[in-house]
Design a protein with these regions (language model features):
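A short, active-site helix/loop in glycosyltransferases that binds the activated sugar's phosphate group
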Residues: 124-154, 159-165
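Short donor-sugar binding/catalytic loops of nucleotide-sugar-dependent glycosyltransferases
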Residues: 1-3, 193-197, 212, 228-231
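N-terminal strand-loop element at the rim of the active site
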Residues: 1-5, 10-56, 139, 144-151, ...
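A conserved mid-protein helix/loop that constitutes part of the nucleotide-sugar donor-binding site
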Residues: 8-13, 188, 192, 197-214
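Glycosyltransferase donor-sugar binding loop
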Residues: 27-33, 159, 193, 222-237
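Short His-centered aromatic/hydrophobic patch
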Residues: 79-85, 103
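A short helix/loop element that forms part of the nucleotide-sugar donor recognition site in Leloir-type
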Residues: 165-183, 239
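Nucleotide-sugar donor phosphate/pyrophosphate-binding loop at the beta->alpha transition
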Residues: 56-61, 98-100, 105-124, 136-144, ...
Length: 239
């Protein structure tokens, strides 16, 4: 699904970048919050249940992707998560198209089956690691899937520098956010953006705030943890 995570926003950004460089862009997704922002004049949107890990639905998605690839003469298929990657792998093998994957995180594996499931992300013609850490993680944990025929490289995450240009920020927009967050306008603000999940470090952030409090006192600053819990109610309540 096209939520607000790094993999999803990267997919969204690339899908809109390609048409600006004389490429036709197709985006296959099951839905999500970013759908309302997609420029349908640039990006051709196709909805399929690609979020599902159900083997029957994954096979259905593969068949649907085969028709989509052939009917639209698609040359390259790029997957960013595991369930859709399996569907894409089968579809690209049958249609003989190039297959690209971006390996965004350290997928957990506690048994051989889970590791095999994860391995689809390194079965492509081109494997993109989002950082040097992920590059090392792949080399360490999935070496048997890497060979000289594959291209394997690091492409760091980027941002839209026009959208995130501080000089374009409006004062009234800042005031509205501070009002929504119920923070004091005259205090310094410490912001922790990111999805609410344990490995993102929100608990460490709170521990760090306690250290800042000892030095400066809570009355000298505001702290905001910003992000979606994506259904992780227990963790958000703990925070």
């Amino acid at each position: 699904k096209l939520g607000y995570g790094g993999a999803e926003t990267g997919c969204y950004d690339l899908a809109h970048y390609l048409p600006e460089n004389n490429c036709i862009s197709y985006l296959v997704t099951s839905g999500g919050q970013l759908l309302k922002f997609i420029d349908k004049k640039k990006v051709k949107l196709i909805k399929l249940p690609v979020h599902s890990k159900n083997p029957v639905l994954m096979l259905f998605n593969s068949i649907a992707l085969i028709f989509i690839i052939l009917l639209n003469n698609i040359s390259i298929v790029h997957a960013r998560s595991r369930a859709p990657a399996w569907s894409c792998l089968l579809a690209t093998i049958i249609t003989r198209r190039k297959f690209v994957t971006t390996f965004h995180g350290t997928y957990n594996f506690k048994n051989p089956f889970k590791k095999f499931y994860n391995s689809v992300m390194v079965r492509s013609d081109l494997i993109i690691a989002g950082s040097n850490f992920i590059f090392s993680h792949i080399n360490k944990n999935y070496p048997k899937y890497l060979d000289l025929k594959k291209k394997f490289l690091v492409i760091f995450r980027g941002i839209n520098v026009d959208y995130f240009d501080p000089s374009t920020t409006l004062d009234n927009e800042e005031d509205r956010l501070k009002s929504d967050w119920e923070v004091n306008k005259n205090k310094k603000m410490i912001l922790m953006p990111g999805r609410l999940t344990a490995w993102k470090g929100q608990e460490t952030f709170i521990e760090a705030l306690n250290l800042v409090n000892k030095e400066l006192g809570y009355e000298s600053f505001n702290a905001v943890i910003l992000g979606s819990d994506q259904g992780r109610d227990i963790y958000s309540k703990k925070i």
